[in-house]
Structures are given as structure tokens and as C-alpha cells.
Amino acid sequence: MKIIKTTLVAGLISLFATFSTFAEKVKIGDPGWTGATAIANLLAAVVNDKMGGEAELVPGNNTAIYGAIDRSKGEIEVHPDIWLPNQQAYTNDLVPKGTLKLSSKPYEGNQGYCVSQQFAKKMNITAIEDLARPEVVKAMDSDGNGKGEFWIGADGWASANVNQVKLRDYGLYDAGIEAIRAAEAVKNARVLDSIKKGEGYAFYCYKPHAIWGMADVVMLTEPKFDEAKYKMVQPKEDADWYKKSYVASKDALKQIQI
């Protein structure tokens, strides 16, 4: 975490080096996931305490944040947690136009799917395909609708779109898994509640993230990253994105930037 914090601060300083003054307020977008909110607050503290400026956090999803940055009217000037290639549909548009500049020092992020250690041991779950077993699906059905709940992310997340496709191409929908989109705070609460009640629950997870300190969870294995099996089209690129996408391997390590 110290390395990440140092990288973030260095990235922020280099990114803001072109700003002529901090007399005016710097508006930092907050896309709402736990890691992004933490980073946004860290960046705000750096601006306020180290750079003599004034920072304001502005909530919004990725589409709203990138749209505001692209308009260059001071509505939002910083995206605190850019995961690439997840968000490249936005960066590939804005960077060449000159309305978005990426920090020069990225750090790595790892994403996948998790269950609690308790649930993994109880049901002998180690890999993503284990979630397709009938007894596992049944154990993940908390509302009695016959579907096992699997949190894939929040509305507006590029990663949630990837996860929606992945679960399909891993055959989990056919096995009875139901993809759930909800705010990350809802997911965090559900993870803790499922452990307390001894229930099954699966969810999209990534590192770095606070969940690893909040609960005893394990990331499941997936087929190793295979570029031939990773063809993701985001809604911004094509309205028929879901049909045209095919993702059946683990994500490559991500480059995270400001």
C-alpha cells in the first residue's frame, strides 16, 4: 500500500505540474467504488495540505466523469482510478483529443471473482467453474428464486460489463447463476452478512481493495489470460456490445492511473 500511495502522490504532482495555480478549486471525480473513493480523498488531501490548493469531490459514474473532463469546463478535472484496458473506450477517445492526460506512473491491479474462505471450504470451491455446480448454486440462492446471486459490479462500471459477458461465456447463467448490479456498499454489506449467516455469495473482486482487510475472502482461479478468448466491446463502442463480446479467460493485470 505504501508503494501505491507513493505512486499516486508522484502521479498527481506530475499530472498537476502543468496547472499554473491552485487558487481555484480542483474538482476530483468520485466514481463510487471503494478504492476510487479512497484515492479521491487521498488526492484531495494532497491538493489541500501539500499543494496549497482547494479540492472538491464530485460523485458520478464513469460516463459522467469522463464527459465532464472532455467538456473542459471545470466541472470535473481528475479521474482518480483509471483501470486500463477496462476504461480504454473513454481514454482512447479523450487522450488523442487532448482533453485527458494520464499520469506517467501506473501501478498494477488484479481483478477476478471471490467467495468467503468459509464458503469455499464448506463447498470445496477453488475455481470459477465450481460455481456452476447445482449444490453451489442452491447455496447461493438467498431469496428462493432458484438463482444463485453473483455481484458483478455497479451500474456504469466498465468492469461490470466485462463480468456480465464473462459469466455468460463461462456458462454460469445456464447453470442458474444470476448477475446482480448494485452499489459497492451494498456488496460489502452483503459479503459480511453472508459470512455471519453462513450463506453462499460470489462477487467481483480486485486488488488493491479494502475488502481484503474487511473479510476473509479468496479469489477463485480462472483460465489464464488468452487474448484470443478476450474480445470485449463496451457499450460506448457499440450498442450491440453484449452480443459482439466474448470473454472466457482471466483478465490480464491492469494498469491503474490517475
Give residue spans per PLM region.
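Sec/Tat signal peptide C-region and signal peptidase I cleavage site
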Residues: 18-23
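Short, polar/charged alpha-helical segment
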Residues: 35-53, 165-167
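Extracytoplasmic "Venus flytrap"
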Residues: 25-41, 62-63
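C-terminal lobe and pocket-closing loops
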Residues: 213-258
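A local structural motif
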Residues: 24-27, 48-60, 144-149, 168-186, ...
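Ligand-binding pocket segment of bilobal, Venus flytrap-like solute-binding proteins
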Residues: 68, 76-80, 151-231
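N-terminal segment of the mature folded domain
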Residues: 62-117
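A conserved helix-loop-strand patch within extracytoplasmic ligand-binding domains
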Residues: 99-151
